[in-house]
Amino acid sequence: MIDVVLLALALSMDAFAVSIGLGAKNKASPVVLGLKAALYFGVFQALMPLIGYLGGKGMLGWLASFAPWVAAGLLALIAAKMIYESFAEGIEEDISQLTHRVLLLLAIATSIDALAAGFALTVLPVAPLVSCALIGVITAIFSFAGVFIGKRAGTWLESKAELAGGLVLLLIALKIIAVAV
């Protein structure tokens, strides 16, 4: 279960970083904005790994011997992307007009990694529904907190959250490889 908690923490970093940005750049009430961010990001971060898990489970029969390598490879790719994004100079997005459509798009964008990571749940000895719920709850908590942190600290912490999440995913990928060998 510790693997799922670490996975949840790592996957929540995208939503956490975006929530920090939302808090820093948006004039809305932090409580209302925090609740919206928690709801959107938490729900999508819970659903996407479940979809990835179900897709991976369907392929597991003919991929059984390669499953740990595929899962580790996907996690390593996600980790590399997150680490790269933590150093990349991003384009400032105008999120001052935060509509439901914008929140929906942000929730989808931040949960694509969770879709791929859901495949890793097929090779971990965990209950998928509990794992996905835990990922969603942890993401919701981090998203809510991120809005308040963004109000206080501004955008400085955004890239640090991405880097930490990427490093944790890389460690999980290495553990999966070590167990498979």
Curated annotation (Swiss-Prot):
Positions of transmembrane segments: 4-24, 31-51, 59-79, 102-122, 129-149, 161-181
Location(s) in or outside the cell: Cell inner membrane
Keywords attached to this entry: Cell inner membrane, Cell membrane, Ion transport, Manganese, Membrane, Transmembrane, Transmembrane helix, Transport
Pfam assignment, any one: Mntp
Molecular-function GO term, any one: manganese ion transmembrane transporter activity
GO cellular component terms, A-Z: plasma membrane
Paired cysteines (S-S): none
Membrane topology: Multi-pass membrane protein
Protein family (similarity comment): Belongs to the MntP (TC 9.B.29) family.
HAMAP family associated with the record: MntP_pump (MF_01521)
Function: Probably functions as a manganese efflux pump.
Name of the protein described by the UniProt record: Putative manganese efflux pump MntP
Lineage, uppermost ranks: Bacteria, Pseudomonadati, Pseudomonadota, Gammaproteobacteria, Cellvibrionales
Gene behind the chain: mntP
